[in-house]
Amino acid sequence: MRHPVVMGNWKLNGSKEMVVDLLNGLNAELEGVTGVDVAVAPPALFVDLAERTLTEAGSAIILGAQNTDLNNSGAFTGDMSPAMLKEFGATHIIIGHSERREYHAESDEFVAKKFAFLKENGLTPVLCIGESDAQNEAGETMAVCARQLDAVINTQGVEALEGAIIAYEPIWAIGTGKAATAEDAQRIHAQIRAHIAEKSEAVAKNVVIQYGGSVKPENAAAYFAQPDIDGALVGGAALDAKSFAAIAKAAAEAKA
């Protein structure tokens, strides 16, 4: 049975004070909550502080990060390696986010190489896929998602998805306040799972597929009630302890 994962992507937000306050607030809000894995991905500069804060609290919250490089060392100014992230306890690494694809021109092939390097280093890739508003209107949603998935599957084999997380994030719903309905999200999640099942039913059955795109406490339960939605990759709501904890609790309750 798939175990739900709710992950907060803090994006380019935070301060030293905010990191400590938010994580301590989350620990308090999540006390006694079981049945869901909760992860946070702070900006790279705050991964160290986040690790120390979580360790001091004896927290079960999983530490992640928002990006990685294709190298573990060398002359790559401004980059950070899987080995460095691993040293600071970060295990769940977001790759392929639409903001990276757009603002940093990261191609499907480049994202697939990051995926492979994370797996090689024993880390968990959180692979973001999803379509733009124009692609959605043109009926190309699944074609885009399949292309982004196949960049990994066709180079590394479908088994590479074992232990990884897929996050379906329709670009038109990220930070816009617009969100796919629970039924529409379920339809796409089922198609994503079916696409993987064409290569391996076992991998498809077990892979965690999150939904991302304006997930809030008010709509989280409706998403998690769907059979193929295994959690959420949360943006704005992850910056508030009560809101993010409410989403995690909704996942735990729905998937119990």
Curated annotation (Swiss-Prot):
Family matches, as InterPro entries? Aldolase_TIM, TIM_sf, TrioseP_Isoase_bac/euk, Triosephosphate_isomerase, Triosephosphate_isomerase_AS
Q: Which residues bind substrate?
A: 9-11, 175, 214, 235-236
Which is an annotated Pfam family here?
Answer: TIM
Q: Where in the cell is it found?
A: Cytoplasm
Kindly state a single biological-process term from the GO annotations of this entry: glyceraldehyde-3-phosphate biosynthetic process
Record pathway: Carbohydrate biosynthesis; gluconeogenesis; Carbohydrate degradation; glycolysis; D-glyceraldehyde 3-phosphate from glycerone phosphate: step 1/1
Which domain of life does this protein belong to? Bacteria
Catalytic activity, as annotated? D-glyceraldehyde 3-phosphate = dihydroxyacetone phosphate
- Its EC top class is isomerase
Where is the major localization of this protein? Answer: cytoplasm
Q: MF terms per GO, please?
A: triose-phosphate isomerase activity
Q: Where is the active site?
A: 97 (electrophile), 169 (proton acceptor)
What GO cellular component is one of the record's annotations? cytosol
What do we know about this protein's activity with respect to temperature?
Answer: Optimum temperature is 15 degrees Celsius.
How would you summarize the oligomeric state and partners of this protein?
Homodimer.
Q: What does this chain do?
A: Involved in the gluconeogenesis. Catalyzes stereospecifically the conversion of dihydroxyacetone phosphate (DHAP) to D-glyceraldehyde-3-phosphate (G3P).
Q: What is stated as this protein's family in its record? A: Belongs to the triosephosphate isomerase family.
Name of the protein in question = Triosephosphate isomerase
Q: Gene encoding it?
A: tpiA
